[in-house]
Structure formats: structure tokens, C-alpha cells
Amino acid sequence: MPGLFITATGTAVGKTWLTRALARNLVRRHHTVAALKPIETGVVSEALDAVAIARASGQPEDAELPSLYRSAPALAPWSLTLRGDHDPLIMDPLVAMISTRGRESEWLLVEAAGGILVPLTERATNADLAAVLGLPLVMVAKDELGTLSHTLTAMESAQRRGLEVAAVVLMQSAPDAGAGSNHDVLSRMLAPTPVLAFRQTEDDDDALADEAERCGLMALLLGD
């Protein structure tokens, strides 16, 4: 079962956009895809990120599977537990649900909640969830001033845990002083891990799928 764990240097850097891009591109290639965001906080009426990636995969019901973790306060699960805002996250049923959907599909895409070391429980982080699932990472970072340290720190955390990183993807939106040079620096410092630049422009699943093609991500993942 091919799959990816889409994580990041932090929150609000473009993971959902990238997951939508991957899901729609794979669907256009006639693959069945389970695109899941098993943990999502900041949920008011519906889990917007989970809904968006499930729709992009053509499986909208994946946003409402049992054992998904949802919370209104936009905090890490362990923070919510400490505050008494949510029951502790139980990893085993979450992992079982993700694994089941993965076995039912040709591709499994799991979008993390926030960055690589977001605490899910007292002892487990997103990195631990990725390790249990056995999925290679796609590390998403925002192409802006300051991302060098953020990305190198996140990558060091992943590598120290023995996690495979398939690619680093720099999400480019508004012009920024660090944009452009970040790619050059990270490509050299993180070699042989590929570093790709994804233009985050049009909010449309098919346009995002096209960009995943243009930036070389699909060729990298599929060996095209």
C-alpha cells in the first residue's frame, strides 16, 4: 500500500493544499485514494481540512469516519487534555482506523495536525504516529524568511527518529524576502532529500493537482 504522511514545520503552512493536490492528481490517474486528517482541532461546525481533502479524493465520507479526533479549541491534543477540554487521545483505535482505510485503497494520504512534533499524548507526537503507520513523510514548509531554521529543525527531528522523508515541499504564496534563496540553501543542506517549490496560487483541486505535476512531486513519487 503506497502512502504518505504529510507533516510540516508548523501550522498553517499549506499541508491541506498539498494533500488536496496529491489526492486529486492520483484520482485523475485512476487510483483509489484514502485522504485522511485523523486529528483536527479548531473545528466549529465541520472539520474543514478533513472535508477538503476527502472531497479532493472523491471519498467525502472519509471526513466522518469513526475514531477521528475533533475539537473546537485550536490546540494540540495533549494541551486540550491538560486543560480538561477533551478526553485523552487514544492512539490504538485511531491507528486501526487509518490502517483499515489504507488497506481498502491504492493510496493512503494522512495529513498531520500541525508540525512534526505536535504532542498528541503525554508521550506521543505526530512523529510517533508516522512511525507507527510506517509511512514516509512529506515535509511542508512555507517559503518565507525564517523557514531555513524551521525546516532544518523539523528535518533533524524526523531523521533522528529514523523517519524516511520523501520530499521537502516549499509552499510559495506571497512574495517574500526569503523566497527563492530558501530552495537553494535547503537543496544543498538536505541533499539527497529532494526539495521542491510548490506555487500556492489558485484554490481549486484540479489547479493544485496540476501544480503537483509541474513542481515535480508526482514524478518523484511515482517514478514517472
Regions picked out by a protein language model, each given a short descriptive name:
Residues 6-7:
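Hydrophobic anchor at the beta1->P-loop junction of P-loop NTPases
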Residues 182-223:
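C-terminal binding/interaction regions
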